[in-house]
Design a protein with these regions (language model features):
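Cytoplasmic helix-loop-helix junction between adjacent transmembrane helices
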Residues: 124-163
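Extracytoplasmic gate region of multi-pass secondary transporters
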Residues: 50, 228-243
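Paired small-residue
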Residues: 108, 119-127
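Residue-level signature of mid-helix packing/kink "hotspots" within the transmembrane helices
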Residues: 75-83, 167-168
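Helix-loop-helix hairpin linking two adjacent transmembrane segments in secondary transporters
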Residues: 159-201
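Helix-loop junctions on the cytosolic side of multi-pass membrane transporters
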Residues: 4, 201-213
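Interfacial helix-cap and linker-helix signal at transmembrane-aqueous boundaries
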Residues: 57-58, 88-89, 173-179
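Conserved MFS/SLC helix-loop-helix module at the cytosolic interface between two early adjacent transmembrane helices
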Residues: 80-116
Length: 243
């Protein structure tokens, strides 16, 4: 009997440990891990600007009511444009709409950070909600399309987990950036969205996608409503903390 060397024993132990701690993405299409990474980047950036919005809006000398409108305009536009975004996905495909939506939010977030008046900030924040709707609807459609029925729950939980993790990390860094300038979080968020959009265009390929599922516009409408409630709850908490 040949006795194993210490190196061989260590390699066997490493293999056993690797088998015990399997990746949660194991067995899922590559698109799921890519979408999870994208959702994390988006959520980090979104969390960056949440504490900055009320402070930035105050610099224009407007009332609390108008500041509240800035806070809610993004979520409202995201909600009302859900069905329109679903039609875009049906016509142009998930990857195109997802990438275009991310770049659209990036541009309008940058413009919001450069806003010189309350009206400009309101318009740019509202327009960004349309791009955000395009991203979320196309990402949801892509998961439905590439993941088998018996794996969709796990895929959706990983995707949502990426967003939640980013949402937890973002506000902490956003608070630090405000000390530099209330505009700074907008610029960082815009850069993160460009990175996320680039990742989507590189790693999500239409040629690998399966047949499309039937239109899920009602589902996307409910997702949009859930996002509105989530955003309003988070931003109201932060807004009242600023009062």
């Amino acid at each position: 009997i040949v006795k194993a060397t210490p190196l061989q024993d260590r390699m066997r132990q490493e293999r056993r440990l690797a088998n015990q701690f399997k990746s949660p993405f194991k067995g899922l299409p590559k698109e799921v891990s890519v979408l999870t990474a994208i959702s994390f980047l988006v959520a980090v950036g979104f969390g960056l600007i949440i504490p900055a919005i009320p402070i930035f809006a105050k610099t224009f000398g407007v009332s609390n009511t108008l500041i509240g409108l800035i806070i809610s305009s993004f979520a409202i536009m995201r909600f009302v444009s859900g069905l329109f975004s679903g039609k875009l996905v049906d016509r142009f495909g998930e990857r195109v709409v997802l990438g275009f939506g991310l770049f659209m939010v990036s541009i309008f977030t940058l413009l919001a950070g450069l806003a010189q008046s309350y009206e400009q900030l309101l318009i740019f924040r509202t327009a960004g909600g349309l791009g955000s709707s395009m991203f979320s609807v196309s990402a949801g459609a892509l998961i439905l399309r590439v993941v088998a029925d018996n794996q969709r729950g796990r895929a959706q939980s990983l995707y949502n987990g990426g967003f939640i993790a980013g949402g937890v990390a973002g506000p902490a860094f956003g608070g630090a950036l405000i000390a530099l300038s209330p505009r700074a979080p907008f610029f960082i968020y815009s850069a993160l969205l460009i990175a996320a959009g680039t990742v989507s265009m590189i790693y999500l390929h239409e040629s690998r996608l399966g047949a499309r599922v039937e239109s899920q516009q009602e589902y996307f409408l409910l997702v949009g409503l859930g996002f509105v409630l989530y955003v309003c709850q988070m931003e109201q908490i932060l807004w009242f903390d600023q009062c």
